[in-house]
Amino acid sequence: MDERQVFVCKLIGKKELFYKGDENYLLIYVYHDQIYNLDNGTQVDTLLSNDSGVAFIVKTKEGTIYHAGDLNDWYWDGEPKADNQRLTSAYRAEIRKIKGMHFDAAFVPLDPRQGNHYADGILYFLKNVDCNVIFPMHYWNDANVIKRFITEYPQYKSRIKNTECAKGEEL
């Protein structure tokens, strides 16, 4: 089993491990707020997303990575104030669980669809978590939002990576 690649997926009403198609892949359906120890020594912790699925903390001997998935401070203009407050509270509660942790890399939403609130989630993350480098995601093919963030918050420039690159270019 050590030679298999592992994909960790959100729970869809199943607890068992199973193989689908290619026996080289092991699918593990996961719950939030759990710790999964893989055969290769990797540990995967999960947080509850306030949108869909889970966020992942992947700990290996080489380092630790955070992948937010859809966990973000989702504030939407035009939505009821109570809905926005609930999403913000849920996001902050999950980030408090990892407050003070160190990540070698993180993948965090920076979503231009949120208008003036596009950076609320990443700012809260940066203020509460230690991270060497952050790769913005969920920017809907609008990489200008990364430049906007770096311009508005130059103190984080050294840690934010522009994930828009040409085909074949490495990050």
Where in this protein do the model-derived segments appear?
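Active-site-proximal segments of metal-dependent phosphoesterases and phosphodiesterases across multiple
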Residues: 79-86, 105-127
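Active-site metal-binding motif and surrounding structural segment of the metallo-beta-lactamase
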Residues: 1-20, 96-107
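Active-site metal-binding loops of divalent metal-dependent hydrolases
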Residues: 11-12, 49, 68-74, 110-112, ...
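Glycine/Thr-rich phosphate-binding loops of Rossmann-like dinucleotide-binding domains
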Residues: 16, 75, 116, 144
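Short acidic/polar alpha-helix capping motifs at helix-coil junctions
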Residues: 18-23, 58, 85-89, 154-160
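Binuclear metal-ion centers of metallo-dependent hydrolases, dominated by the metallo-beta-lactamase
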Residues: 25-39, 97, 118-171
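Structural motif
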Residues: 7, 65-68, 105-107, 135
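Core dinuclear metal-dependent hydrolase active-site scaffold
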Residues: 25-102, 165-171
